[in-house]
Structures are given as C-alpha cells and as structure tokens.
C-alpha cells in the first residue's frame, strides 16, 4: 500500500549515491541484539560508549574470543554500526567528550524482527484488531456524515492510511514470521527423527501440537474480527460511490479489503498445509516403527543363528487353539464332535440364522399395516418389539424393524421438509426419529 514517488532507477541511484549497505555477521548481529535488549531496560533509551563496550564484552565471551583486544574490536564494531546507520552517535560536551548512542529506526526494525515480533501473542493480536475495528468504525461514521475535502482527508483517509494499513502490515508480518517458525519446527523435527526417532516421538508430538495450536489461535482471532472489519470497509466504499474526487479513498479501501482477504485466506491455507505435514510425520513414524520392529526381530534371529554354537538355544513351538472373535457376524462357530447330549440352554445358532428368522417374523407382523392401510407409527411398534428382547439385542432388532418398515411404504410428512419428533423406544435412552408411514 505504499506509494512510491520515485521510479526504480531513481531509487537505485539514490541508494548508490548514499552508499547504503548492511553487513551483519553473526557476532555483529548478536552485538546489535544485546544493545537492543539493554536499551529496552533503560528509560531514556540512550547508551554510553562504556555500556556498549560492556555489551560487546558479553558477546565476545559468548563467542569464546580473546579478551585482550575487546576494547579495540568493540570500537571497530561501534564505528561500523554507525557507518551502516544502525546507531546514531551524539557528542556531548557536558559528558567530558563521551559520546551518547541511540538505535536508529533501521536498527530498531532489525532487532524488533529478531526479538519482539517472534513472540506470538493472541492478546497482542486481539488488541491490534480491536484498535483496527475502532479506527474503521470511526472512519465509516465520518464517511457516512460526509463533508469537504479536508474532512475526507483528516477523518477518513488518514486513519485508514496511517493506522489501519500499518496494523494490517504488522499482522501480515506476524504471519510471515510464523511461516519461518513453521520451517524451523520442520527442521527441528527432521533433526530429531534422524538422531533417534524413539526418543524423538514425544518431542515431535509437542512441536506439532504447539504449532497447530498457535496457527489455530491466530486464525480464530482473525476470523472472529474479519466480518466486522469488512462490513465497515464496505460502508466506507458505499459512501464514496458517485464521488469522482474520492477515488483515492476508494482505491485505499480496495487495497485494504484485498490485504484483509489475503491475510485470512493465507491463515486457513497455512493450517491446511500444516495438517498435511502433521499427517506426513505421523505416517513416517508409524512406518518407521513397523520397519524397525521387523528389522530388530530379523537382526536378533540372524545373530542367534550365527552364534548358535557359542550360545545354544532351543525353540519351543506351541500350537494353541484358535481364538474366536464373537463380534464377527460372519464367523461360524466350530462344530466339533462331542459325546453325550447338550442341554437346550447350551445349544448355539449362527447369528445370520437368527437374523433371518427375526426378519421373517417382523415382515409377517408388519404386513397387517399394509393390507389394512393402517398408519404405522414406527416408534410405538419398535418399542413393543424391543420389550420382548434383552437389552443386548435391541440394536439388531431395531435395525431389522426399520429395514422391514421402509420396504412397506413411505411417510407423506417426509416431503414437507419438517423434522420428525424423537420418540423413546426403550427404557435405556434409545430414541428414533421417524414420521408415521401412511403411504404404501
């Protein structure tokens, strides 16, 4: 949304003329971050040369550099940062010739990126969106009131340009920083899995869940405020319709709408991409577990065979009876020959045979409704049937009753689009929602 008053060749010539350059090796960047941290603890925002040397001494110690030349190297680093317009130097005659240093906007911007902007805060984002909502509402009210050119510039254009747009840029920057954080988390997970995936599983889970939670918090906060922001932008846009002299406001509103749409859209896309990556990591871990399990077993077996004469071993094989899964309806019970007669209570039947018998009985009982053209209240009929069977059979019997009932006819109330009332069908909380079948 920035409007450049110069062309690209003019900007290139300007940068060349002023000899703009930034060179920050790791130790110099650490020194700049140390200055920003110490500067943030001071009320006046000023630092003396001695304080800068002390900060450089801490950095030099962290990089395990020699202490003999700290003063010389600190002086060189300070002069270099002044030359690169990261620090401003002020000579004070009242301080015996000692200089006073302040961070420049460029220095603050760099350190702010590395320190403050990397800390995602839902509260901070909520406050930003609250300020944006207030500014947009105030601008929309001013646009509805109308006025002269000064009114539009001061009460509509200025808040949009210098408050709303800047906060949108800040939110966009937060999203881009989180993109980098996601890449950093991916690198951390890859490093953990390459070292020892067994020990890394819990750490990977923590990194994945934390990043997912942060992305979701950001997106929920944006979506909660997005509709109100768009509504106020539309109010301003409607107020500028028909005014040719207000084209600059209309263009600004369009740019703000596009940026807001892009922010919300990218937030959801980032969540979708992260979900895909999350599934990929879990699939990799499951595959690694299966492969490692088989590899360990094969390795142990191979070692046991190779070292048999040094460490003899015996293999005991047990042939146990096959276990039956009673939940599988298609499994047939084993019919081994037995001696003697079993009591009737111990005789078994396949569930498929019982189901066929029940279906035939229910079909025969329900035909009366079709032959006599009687309304079939499925809830009442089902309750009567379930009362005849134990609770363990209620689900299967209810399913059979529904299957047979829908074959007989339909309910005209189904075509009205109105939902049916829930009816209790047993004493254990089960309910059914169905209209009375009255058309066979």
Swiss-Prot record:
Subunit composition and interactions: Interacts, and probably forms a ternary complex, with MukE and MukB via its C-terminal region. The complex formation is stimulated by calcium or magnesium. It is required for an interaction between MukE and MukB.
Keyword list, A-Z: Calcium, Cell cycle, Cell division, Chromosome partition, Cytoplasm, DNA condensation
Pfam families: KicB, MukF_C, MukF_M
Keyword Calcium: yes
UniProt region (Leucine-zipper), positions on chain: 208-236
Protein name: Chromosome partition protein MukF
GO molecular function, one term: calcium ion binding
Origin: domain of life: Bacteria
């Amino acid at each position: 949304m920035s409007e450049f008053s110069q062309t690209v060749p003019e900007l290139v010539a300007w940068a060349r003329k002023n000899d703009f350059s930034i060179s920050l090796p790791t130790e110099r960047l650490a020194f700049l971050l140390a200055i920003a941290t110490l500067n943030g603890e001071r009320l006046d925002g000023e630092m003396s040369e001695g304080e800068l040397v002390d900060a450089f001494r801490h950095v030099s110690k962290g990089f395990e550099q020699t202490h003999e030349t700290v003063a010389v190297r600190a002086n060189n680093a300070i002069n270099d940062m002044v030359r690169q317009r990261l620090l401003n130097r002020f000579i004070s005659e009242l301080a015996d010739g000692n200089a006073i240093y302040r961070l420049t906007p460029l220095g603050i911007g760099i350190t702010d990126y590395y320190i403050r902007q990397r800390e995602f805060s839902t509260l901070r984002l909520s406050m930003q969106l609250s300020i944006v909502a207030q500014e947009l509402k105030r601008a929309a009210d001013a646009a509805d009131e109308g006025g002269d050119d000064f009114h539009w510039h001061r009460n509509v254009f200025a808040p949009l340009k210098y408050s709303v747009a800047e906060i949108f840029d800040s939110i966009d920057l937060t999203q881009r920083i989180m993109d980098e954080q996601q890449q950093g988390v991916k690198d951390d997970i890859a490093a953990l899995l390459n070292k020892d995936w067994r020990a890394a599983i819990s750490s990977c889970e923590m990194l994945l869940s934390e990043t997912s939670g942060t992305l979701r918090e950001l997106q929920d906060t944006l979506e909660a405020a997005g509709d109100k922001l768009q509504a106020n932008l539309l109010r301003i846009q409607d107020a500028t319709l028909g005014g040719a002299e207000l084209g600059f406001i209309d263009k600004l509103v369009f740019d703000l709408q596009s940026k807001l749409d892009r922010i919300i859209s990218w937030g959801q896309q980032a969540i979708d991409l992260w979900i895909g990556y999350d599934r990929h990591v879990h699939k990799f871990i499951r595959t690694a577990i299966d492969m490692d399990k088989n590899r360990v077993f094969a390795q142990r077996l191979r070692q046991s065979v190779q070292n048999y004469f040094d460490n003899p071993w015996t293999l005991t094989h047990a042939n146990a009876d096959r276990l039956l899964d009673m939940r599988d309806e298609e499994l047939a019970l084993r019919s081994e020959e037995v001696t003697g007669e079993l009591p009737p209570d111990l005789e078994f039947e396949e569930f498929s045979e019982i189901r066929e018998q029940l279906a035939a009985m229910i079909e025969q009982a329900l035909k009366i409704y079709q032959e006599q053209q009687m309304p079939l209240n499925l809830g009442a009929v089902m309750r009567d049937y379930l009362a005849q069977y134990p609770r363990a059979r209620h689900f299967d019997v209810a399913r059979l009753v529904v299957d047979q009932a829908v074959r007989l006819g339909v309910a005209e109330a189904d075509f009205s689009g109105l939902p049916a009332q829930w009816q209790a069908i047993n004493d254990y909380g089960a309910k059914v929602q169905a209209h009375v079948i009255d058309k066979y």
